[in-house]
C-alpha cells in the first residue's frame, strides 16, 4: 500500500522515470549535486525544455544522490485532465495560477511567493520552478526578472537577504533531441503570423510526446547556490535593478553549465554559415 507522496515517488515515479530513460535516452547524467548538502533545502531554478521531465528526472537524480525529492510547480493550464491532476498531487506538485486582472495576478504571485518561502524556509522542503513562464521554444534560455521579484515579494526587511534565505540553485538541462521539437517549431511558425491559439488536448499531447519520443543524451548540471556572499554586491541597487541582476546571475550560471550537443553545433552552423 502507498499512503504518502514520498512513497509514491520512490515506489512508482522513480521506476517510471528509470523506464523512460531506458526506452528513450541513450545516456542520462546529472552533475553538481555533490556540491549541495542533503539536509539543506534549495529552490531549484531550471531552464525549461520539457513539461514533465525537466523536474521529474531531477527527482531521480536527487534520490540517487541521497537527497529528499523536491516539490514541483505546475501551471494551472496543465491541471485540466483528471489523470494529470491525480498524478500531480501524488507527486508533490502544486498548482501555479496564471492570468486574471492586475489585482488577481498580484495576489496569485504573492500567494506563490509565500508558499515557496514557507516550503523552503519553514518546512525545509526543496522546490523546483522553471526560470520562465512556459517552455523555451527557441533555445534561448532567459530568466524572467518578474520571477525573481516574485521570490522577494514574501520576504521581510532586506530583499536580497530574503532571496539568499531561499538558497536559489540554477539548474541547466540539455537534451540531444527535444522530443517536442516539431510541435514547438510549428507553434513558433504559426505565432509569427498571428496570435497562437492552443487547441484542446495540446498540452496532454506534448506531455506524452515528451515522455515517449527519443531524447538521445540527456545532461543536467546543478550549479552552486546563490547565497548571501554572491548577492551582497547588489545591496546598493534599487529593487528592480537588483532583481534584473539576479536574473542575469541565474542566466549566466545556466548558460555556463549547459551541455552543448552536436545538434546545437549543427543549428549554429545553419544560422551562421559564414563562420
Language model segments and positions:
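Short helix/loop capping segments that flank catalytic or ligand/cofactor-binding pockets
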Residues: 52-55, 82-83, 138-139, 179
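Conserved nucleotide-cofactor-binding alpha/beta core module
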Residues: 71-102, 106-107
Amino acid at each position: 500500500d502507498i499512503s504518502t507522496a514520498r512513497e509514491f515517488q520512490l515506489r512508482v515515479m522513480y521506476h517510471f522515470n528509470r523506464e523512460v530513460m531506458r526506452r528513450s535516452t541513450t545516456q542520462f547524467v546529472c552533475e553538481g549535486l555533490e556540491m549541495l548538502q542533503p539536509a539543506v533545502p534549495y529552490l531549484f531554478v531550471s531552464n525549461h525544455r520539457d513539461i514533465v521531465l525537466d523536474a521529474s528526472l531531477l527527482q531521480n537524480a536527487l534520490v540517487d544522490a541521497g537527497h529528499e525529492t523536491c516539490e514541483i510547480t505546475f501551471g494551472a493550464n496543465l491541471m485540466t485532465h483528471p489523470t494529470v491532476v491525480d498524478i500531480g498531487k501524488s507527486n508533490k506538485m502544486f498548482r501555479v495560477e496564471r492570468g486574471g486582472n492586475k489585482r488577481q495576478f498580484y495576489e496569485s504571485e504573492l500567494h506563490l511567493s509565500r508558499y515557496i518561502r514557507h516550503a523552503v524556509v519553514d518546512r525545509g522542503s526543496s522546490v523546483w520552478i522553471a526560470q520562465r513562464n512556459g517552455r523555451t521554444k527557441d533555445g534561448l534560455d532567459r530568466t524572467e526578472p518578474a520571477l525573481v521579484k516574485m521570490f522577494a515579494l514574501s520576504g521581510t526587511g532586506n530583499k536580497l537577504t530574503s532571496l539568499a534565505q531561499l538558497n536559489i540553485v540554477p539548474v541547466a538541462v540539455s537534451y540531444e533531441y527535444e522530443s517536442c521539437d516539431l510541435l514547438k517549431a510549428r507553434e513558433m511558425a504559426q505565432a509569427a503570423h498571428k496570435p497562437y491559439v492552443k487547441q484542446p488536448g495540446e498540452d496532454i499531447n506534448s506531455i506524452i510526446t515528451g515522455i515517449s519520443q527519443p531524447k538521445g543524451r540527456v545532461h543536467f548540471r546543478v550549479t552552486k547556490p546563490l547565497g548571501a556572499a554572491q548577492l551582497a554586491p547588489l545591496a546598493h541597487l534599487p529593487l528592480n535593478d537588483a532583481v534584473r541582476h539576479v536574473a542575469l546571475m541565474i542566466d549566466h550560471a545556466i548558460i555556463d553549465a549547459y551541455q552543448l550537443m552536436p545538434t546545437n553545433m549543427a543549428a549554429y552552423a545553419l544560422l551562421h554559415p559564414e563562420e
